[in-house]
């Protein structure tokens, strides 16, 4: 009953010569997906070596504001609860204290709200923050590096994680975080990132080395940096309201928090987000291979 989906790029009516992203789907999905540019072929006719799982489930929310962002950060992150069941975390920056404030909880037996609501007073006075619901890594992580201090959250699936782990260890790097006894993907991504001379260069280094998928939000003392996976496999949506911007995995949170959808971040695009505006650090790629499971499995129905 299983079929293979291929999302191909076309050049003057002919398939472009490039690798394709492939995912599994049920036979019943064939009709609805073929109408949006997917090609359905029998699984047994294809080599299984080309199959790439899109991502571990997870969703993030980040906001920068002229005023306190605590309520938006709390509820915005909670709106991603359908995307993960194991870990939840928030990090915010307090300008007056010049400090990052972080909280991480296990969600396997409790809901996000019941875990985080008692600790919200710690975040009072913060005007920027990021949050994550994750099925694997404990995050956000707060890093101190030559690029400055920053917090990071990721929605990622790294296929070559063992190869990258060995490469970094050979460079005398070390890993301090473990997730279920394995290397924390977010820490590995942070180590690749800080090899760059700038945040943009560091994120491009991540794009160049990671096989699989990786979208991220970085929280700095100057706002948020949003970077979508190079192939666009997982989305980032930008919203805005008076005096504030938000970046999130799905748009379902915007209506109840007073945001309007501003734009969709493109594949490989990098944006620096401040309360007064958005700066593009890297232009988007021309081709996108978004994960089709957003529509048929784990995406929230009201998200665009």
Predicted regions and their residues:
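Conserved short alpha-helical segments that host acidic/polar catalytic motifs at enzyme active sites
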Residues: 52-267, 272-304
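Polybasic, lysine-rich low-complexity intrinsically disordered segments
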Residues: 7, 17-18, 27
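Short, Lys/Arg-enriched N-terminal segments with co-localized hydrophobic residues
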Residues: 38-56
């Amino acid at each position: 009953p299983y079929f293979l989906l291929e999302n191909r790029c076309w050049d003057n009516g002919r398939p472009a010569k490039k690798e394709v992203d492939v995912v599994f789907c049920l036979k019943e999905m064939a009709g609805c997906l073929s109408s949006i540019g997917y090609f359905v072929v029998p699984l047994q006719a294809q080599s299984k070596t080309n199959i790439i799982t899109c991502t571990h489930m997870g969703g993030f929310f980040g906001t920068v504001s002229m005023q306190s962002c605590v309520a938006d950060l709390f509820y915005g992150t909670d709106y991603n609860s359908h995307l993960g069941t194991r870990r939840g975390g928030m990090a915010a920056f307090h300008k007056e204290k010049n400090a990052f404030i972080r909280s991480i909880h296990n969600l396997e037996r409790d809901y996000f709200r019941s875990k985080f609501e008692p600790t919200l007073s710690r975040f009072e006075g913060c005007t920027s923050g990021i949050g994550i619901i994750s099925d694997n890594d404990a995050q956000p992580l707060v890093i101190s590096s030559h690029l400055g201090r920053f917090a990071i959250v990721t929605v990622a699936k790294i296929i070559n994680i063992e190869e990258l782990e060995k490469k970094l260890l050979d460079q005398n790097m070390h890993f301090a975080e473990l997730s279920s006894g394995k290397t924390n993907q977010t820490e590995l991504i942070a180590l690749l990132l800080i090899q760059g001379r700038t945040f943009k260069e560091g994120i491009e280094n991540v794009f160049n080395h990671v096989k699989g998928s990786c979208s991220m939000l970085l929280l700095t003392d100057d706002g948020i940096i949003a970077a979508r996976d190079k192939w666009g496999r997982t989305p980032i949506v930008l919203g805005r309201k008076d005096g504030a911007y938000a970046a999130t995995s799905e748009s379902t949170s915007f209506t109840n928090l007073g945001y309007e959808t501003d734009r969709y971040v493109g594949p490989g695009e990098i944006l620096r987000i401040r309360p007064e505006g958005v700066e593009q650090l890297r232009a988007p790629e021309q081709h996108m291979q978004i994960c089709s499971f957003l529509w048929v499995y784990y995406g929230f129905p009201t998200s665009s």
